[in-house]
A protein has these predicted regions:
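Bacterial Sec-dependent N-terminal signal peptides
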Residues: 1-21
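Carbohydrate-interacting regions of secretory-pathway proteins
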Residues: 20-198
């Protein structure tokens, strides 16, 4: 009995010791650990990461230097202007041509929380229309993106938006990237960007 108890305690301690913790991937000071792709504006102001359309009104991305396969990402965002943004995952980039999948961040009525495949199949899944109420446009929102194997789940302000199983996503690899859509007129603030590798 004592041996079983000892082994049980040892197993629990090992799990606790090796369990991954969420870590911040934005230090609130500069863009260390990230790479700017394109000519659009990415800068830090008062501890917040800001993306803003530049004079070229083109696509722009801020990608992590590290690649992430299976993870649970949380962040906060606030939209200060009309326009489309998003969080790419398991992605690769050539200039400003990005391949991979995007968890949508957009104005009301534009599928925030949905999953879009860039240069591929397009929209894979959109949230049900009534879930649009969970987005607080012009205010701080909490976004959660969990990617494990071939499954993707998104939440906005604690509400599940979509759950998707997709074989192609399961085979994907690459970095995480924040997006500025082309067309101009975009400004989004981001903060508290944390990731737990799974």
């Amino acid at each position: 009995m004592k041996k079983i108890l000892f082994l049980l305690v040892a197993a629990i301690c090992s799990i606790t010791l090796f369990a991954q913790k969420a870590v911040s991937i934005f230090n609130g000071k500069d863009l260390s650990g990230w790479t700017i792709n394109g000519t659009e504006k990415w800068y830090v102001e008062k501890g917040e990461l800001i993306c803003e359309s530049g004079p070229d009104k083109a696509y722009g991305y801020l990608s992590t230097d590290k690649k992430y396969k299976n993870f649970d990402l949380t962040l906060q965002f606030k939209q200060e202007a009309e326009g489309n943004s998003g969080i790419f995952f398991r992605s690769s980039i050539d200039g400003v041509k990005i391949s991979g999948w995007q968890a949508e961040v957009a104005p009301p009525g534009s599928n925030t929380g949905g999953i879009y495949e860039s240069y591929g199949r397009g929209w894979l899944i959109n949230p049900e229309a009534e879930k649009d109420q969970f987005l607080k446009y012009g205010q701080w929102n909490t976004y959660r993106l969990k990617v494990v194997g071939d499954e993707v789940t998104t939440w906005v302000n604690g509400h599940e938006m979509i759950h998707l199983k997709d074989e192609k996503i399961g085979k994907g690899e690459g970095f995480i990237a924040l997006q500025i859509h082309d067309g101009g007129g975009i400004k989004v603030r981001w903060k508290n960007i944390k990731i737990k590798e799974l």
